[in-house]
Amino acid sequence: MSFTEDQEKIALEILSKDKHEFYEILKVDRKATDSEIKKAYRKLAIKLHPDKNSHPKAGEAFKVINRAFEVLSNEEKRSIYDRIGRDPDDRQMPSRGAASGFRGSAGGSPMGGGFEDMFFNSRFGGQRAGPPEDIFDFLFNAGGSPFGASPFGPSASTFSFGGPGGFRVYTNNRGGSPFMRQQPRSRQQQQQAEENAVNSQLKNMLVLFIIFIVLPMIKDYLFS
């Protein structure tokens, strides 16, 4: 199978780039308009289409530019990509933002805005943190995942048992074991627990009093 030097060069050049670097793959600026993106894609597609390029890697390179164009030509996907720095449909690799976030920033959170921006900011409307209940709801109830679904599945559910001091159960409804977290006890329940402990101690003392004081007195009275 014959191919030209230029055909080999363009195919290998595309494949040498990170598969998530969509702007670099299409050779356009990050502020490129839709028409500029389409023009750049068509230019590359003509050179890489298997019918036009006989290099063994041309088909693979063609798929790469197709994916880049599919994301950048879609307003919603492009917006997500610009935020997380990777293919919004690929959940296997950590985002560039999350990876760089662990380096920290001067005077700021050691997370540096990577992981927090990706998850907490999208969940809590730009705030850096939220109540523990909100975080659990986010993790188990599809409550604002940056990919539109809970990481534990779209069918996750929450059930509460035993009132304020009971348990909140999170389950993905797929036959797996539920996740349980005890809710904070109310002040009234804490007081009740303390009273129960005192009563238990009094009962123990009463038993000892009967054994060592009352019973010997009864014995002396009966057999004296």
Curated annotation (Swiss-Prot):
Ranges of biased composition (kind: Basic and acidic residues): 84-93
Residue ranges, annotated region (Disordered): 84-107, 173-192
Endpoints of the signal sequence: none
A GO cellular-component term linked to this record: endoplasmic reticulum membrane
Keywords on record: Chaperone, Phosphoprotein
Ranges of residues in domain J: 18-87
UniProt cross-references to Gene3D superfamilies, sorted A to Z: DnaJ domain
Biased composition (Low complexity): 181-192
Positions of post-translational Phosphoserine modification: S109
Listed InterPro entries: DnaJ_domain, DnaJ_domain_CS, DnaJ_subfamily_B/C, J_dom_sf
Keyword Protease included in the entry's annotation: no
Short name of any one Pfam family annotated for the protein: DnaJ
Alphabetical GO biological process terms: ERAD pathway
Single Gene Ontology MF annotation: ATPase activator activity
Note: Present with 1840 molecules/cell in log phase SD medium.
PANTHER family: AT29763P-RELATED
Identification of the protein by name: Protein HLJ1
Gene that produces this protein: HLJ1
